[in-house]
Every structure is written in structure tokens, then in C-alpha cells.
A protein has these predicted regions:
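Generic detector of low-complexity/intrinsically disordered segments
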Residues: 18, 264, 363-366, 370
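Conserved SAM/SAH-binding loop
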Residues: 104-107, 370-374
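Conserved P-loop NTPase motor core of helicases/translocases
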Residues: 372-385
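Serine/proline-rich low-complexity intrinsically disordered segments, especially terminal tails, linkers
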Residues: 59, 127, 367, 376-379
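Short, conserved SAM-binding/catalytic segment
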Residues: 92-95, 354-368
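Non-catalytic, charged low-complexity extensions flanking SF2 helicase motor domains
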Residues: 29-32, 370, 382
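Core catalytic lobe of class I
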Residues: 1-351, 390
Length: 390
């Protein structure tokens, strides 16, 4: 608890010298936060039939891969306050979206979710460091990713675009390219390393980062087997204007003497209302305390999947999300007119996602596919049953 309190004070810019600890003691305590040796946050369980066999090696793997960018850990656990409603195998019908509680590395789970559909796009943010604590061992990250993305192939069209958000990890004072083996595996299965984008999260996090600059970005890896042109989603600065400034500050007309729009304008680019997005995605990260302001230790802002969804899919198309988390991608799909098919392995986070969706999208009906019952009815029945059993 002392370590977490010091980390919180450092984050808000408090002078830690006033705590009475020496500079060396403070550095050692904050190192525990950076190395992930405080409460909270293992990566998602391995996919996962091999999880039990990997439990012993999992502890060693935990020490090898740490999140060096920010303290995402916290003692908060949604399941600690109330028993989960959702159970493994549940499929929740949320408007025209589907959310299944299960293992995204299990082809049977993916088949139950998709029901023969295939998605045009996959946008996801897998756990990549000590982010979530399932009290079941962290497993092996490569095995997790291989299992999930092997099963995902049955959920995706051959021309699907696949975008994966990952952040940096530091260990032993070095940045660790932990994704290398997984990317090589993806290439061996025919996925091209099509693009590598940067998510600019805004101002860097406060604190001392062992001499590194304050972290303020993550990556988005773009894989595909076939090209798809990005949609033009960004308004052009001079759209609709009849004049344009030259580099020297003088102006030039965008119309000819006959009044017609010229075919070419600024820097020999055609006049247009919209353009394709930049490869640097400028979206502020979520801020707040886990359990008070946010309900998931690695929640990403709705604007991030919205950005990708609008760039690489059209209204009415299907988006696949194998790491459903707290429902961010599903919310983005509803707001943009896409159809989401999401998997989440942890029942407590399925409940968190449903509650968040009910708050942000109150018009959507939420029913259990197996019975057609609404979520509240299922919750009442299952919690009553749990009390009787107790």
C-alpha cells in the first residue's frame, strides 16, 4: 500500500522528498511500481488449454515481462463486490451486437459467437503486461496471442484488416520487443506487417521514469492479407474555401477565371473535403482511479476504436473484438453504425461491459440468447440461486 500511495503522489507531482524517505529509498519503492511487483495486474490467461501446464513457467514469465510505461495495477476487482451474473458460454444479445463469455482462443467459442458471420475488421487491445489479475496464473503471452489469432481466422474475412494496440515494456533497463515472435508467427500464417502506427496519448505521465522521457504513446500494429483503402474521415483544412495560402504567405485562387474549381490546389493535391487519417493517432488516454473513474485496468478511450472503425470499415459491417474488456469496442460500433462481435474470458468483465453499455447506450436491449431473458431477470435468478446455495 505504501508503494501505491507513493506512486499516486508522484503522479500528481508531489515532492516525495517531503515524505521523509531518502532519494534512494524512494527510487527503490517506485521501481517496484514500474516492475509490476505491487498488487494488481497479470496479463490475460493463456489460451488456454495449456494454462495448467504452463502455471509453473508462468511465474518466471511474469518476471520477464513487465509494464514499464505506467502503473496500470490496482487492487480493484469487480467480482470482489458482488457475484458475477455472467457465466462461461453465455451469449448476450445487445441490440444487434453479440458478446460471449468465453475463451477467444477456443474455436468453439468463436463459432458460437459468429454463427457463420465473418468480420471486415478486427480492432483490439490485448493485455501485454501486468494489467489484469485473474488469480489463475499469467500464462505465456506468445501462446495467448497465437491461440487467439489462430481462432480469429475463422471469424475474419480473407480481406479483413486486423489492428492491434500494444504498448512498450521495459525489463532490466531495456525496452523489450516482446511482440517479435508473435509477429513472426503472424507472417508465417500469411498476415502482412502492413502498417505500424503511433497512438499519441497526450502529455506524458508525471514521475521519474529511470531517466527515460515520460511515456505518452503506444503502438497500433496493422496486419492484412489484402489492401483496403482507408476511408477519408478527416476534414481538409481548406475545404470549401476559394483561396489558399502559399508557403510564402501569399494567396492563390482555387477557381479558374470561368469560376470552376481547379483540379489541383495546395502542393499539387486535388481539392477535397476529407482526407485519410494520419499514422499518428492523437487521442487522449483515459485518466482516473480504477474502481472509481474507470472499470478496467487497461481501458482505452472509445475514440481509439472509433478512429480505426471509421477508417477501415463501413456502416453495417461486422467488427470482431477478441479481448472485449469493458465493452469499449462494442460501444464504438454502436455509435458508428457497425455490428460488433466480442469475446471476453472473465465473467466479471462481461458484467462490467454490460453495465457500462447500459449507462452509455440506455436504448439497447440486452438479453441472454439461450433463454431470451433480459439481463436484470437473469441477474435476479442467478443471485437468488447463489444465496440459496450458500
Amino acid at each position: 500500500l505504501l508503494v501505491l500511495e507513493l506512486a499516486d503522489l508522484a503522479e500528481v507531482g508531489f515532492d516525495l522528498d517531503m515524505t521523509g524517505f531518502t532519494a534512494t529509498e524512494i527510487e527503490r519503492l517506485l521501481d517496484l511500481v514500474e516492475d509490476g511487483d505491487v498488487a494488481g495486474g497479470d496479463p490475460e490467461p493463456v489460451s488456454r488449454a495449456a494454462e495448467a501446464a504452463n502455471d509453473e513457467s508462468a511465474d518466471a514469465d511474469a518476471d520477464a515481462i513487465h509494464n514499464g510505461e505506467e502503473d496500470r495495477g490496482d487492487d480493484y476487482d469487480p467480482a470482489s463486490t458482488i457475484a458475477s451474473v455472467s457465466r462461461a458460454g453465455d451469449v448476450w444479445i445487445i441490440g444487434r451486437h453479440r458478446l460471449i463469455c468465453g475463451d477467444a482462443g477456443d474455436p468453439a467459442v468463436v463459432a458460437a459467437l459468429m454463427r457463420g458471420e465473418t468480420a471486415h475488421l478486427c480492432i483490439t487491445s490485448p493485455p501485454y503486461a501486468r494489467q489484469r489479475d485473474y488469480a489463475s496464473g499469467i500464462g505465456d503471452w506468445d501462446a495467448l496471442m497465437r491461440g487467439v489469432f489462430a481462432a480469429a481466422e475463422d471469424a475474419l474475412r480473407d480481406d479483413a484488416q486486423l489492428l492491434v494496440n500494444l504498448g512498450l515494456v521495459h525489463d532490466d533497463n531495456e525496452m523489450q520487443p516482446y511482440w517479435d515472435a508473435w509477429i513472426a508467427w503472424m507472417r508465417a500464417r500469411g498476415w502482412r506487417r502492413f502498417g505500424w502506427y503511433v497512438w499519441d496519448q497526450g502529455p506524458g505521465l508525471p514521475g521519474d521514469w529511470r531517466g527515460r522521457l515520460a511515456p505518452s504513446f503506444e503502438f497500433v500494429f496493422h496486419f492484412n492479407r489484402h489492401n483496403r483503402k482507408a476511408n477519408k474521415t478527416v476534414p481538409c483544412k481548406f475545404a470549401g474555401q476559394d483561396i489558399h495560402l502559399r508557403a510564402d504567405g501569399s494567396s492563390t485562387a482555387l477557381r479558374g477565371r470561368d469560376g470552376g474549381a481547379l483540379a489541383w490546389s495546395h502542393e499539387h493535391q486535388p481539392t477535397q473535403d476529407m482526407r485519410i487519417p494520419d499514422s499518428v493517432i492523437r487521442i487522449m488516454r483515459h485518466k482516473g482511479k480504477l474502481g472509481r473513474d474507470i472499470d478496467h485496468p487497461a481501458v482505452f478511450p472509445v475514440a481509439l476504436p472509433t478512429f480505426v472503425i471509421e477508417a477501415y470499415s463501413d456502416a453495417g459491417e461486422v467488427v470482431y473484438e477478441p479481448f472485449g474488456g469493458s465493452g469499449t469496442t462494442l460501444i464504438a460500433c454502436e455509435r458508428t453504425g457497425r455490428i460488433c462481435r466480442a469475446v471476453e474470458i472473465a465473467a466479471e468483465y462481461v458484467d462490467v461491459a454490460i453495465e457500462r453499455i447500459r449507462q452509455q447506450l440506455p436504448g439497447l436491449s440486452i438479453t441472454l440468447e439461450a433463454t431470451g431473458e433480459p439481463f436484470d431477470s437473469v441477474a435476479a435468478e442467478r443471485r437468488d440461486g447463489a444465496r440459496v446455495a450458500a
